Amino acid sequence: MFTKTFGCVRFIYNKMLGDRLDYYKETGKKLKNTPAQYKEEFPWLREVDSLALTNAQMNLNKAYSNFWSNKKHFGKPRFKSKKTGHASYSTNNQHGSVRIEENKVKLPKIGWVKLCLHRPLMENSIIKTVTISKTPSGKYYISILVEYENQILLIIPKKFLGLDFAMHGLYAVSYTHLRAHET
């Protein structure tokens, strides 16, 4: 199923890029298309996670915005090749669609997958995005983006000191009476 999702994400990216280039050549305007528009023509796109396809659209939009903001640095968006051997896709956690239990991770449209977690997740962390990658050697990796609040440690002071400064040259300290201000 990973291979199918990688292929569909690459296909939708390339199809949207090709359609956008053709439309721009014909009209000189930007085509605003979505992955959902292609599901009628290509019903096999329904078999994979829709958020993975939406993230492919967002990656294409980001590539175009980078290109238009700095043409010298970024260059024109290019078609994705299946021959590189590297493939990846990202999906978002919607209403608990991605979760980790014991040594397994649940992914949308795929189900439970064995996982070797390299470091534990923080308590009360919320999974935001998961990126699944395949290297040219055939190894799979999952990168998990989480959000959590830093817990501020409450420091309880042992002594309290109160100061009160008066403009006429005296100050009051909580453990004694009045003192003259020394300059």
PLM-predicted stretches and their roles:
Residues 1-179:
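Nucleic-acid substrate recognition interfaces
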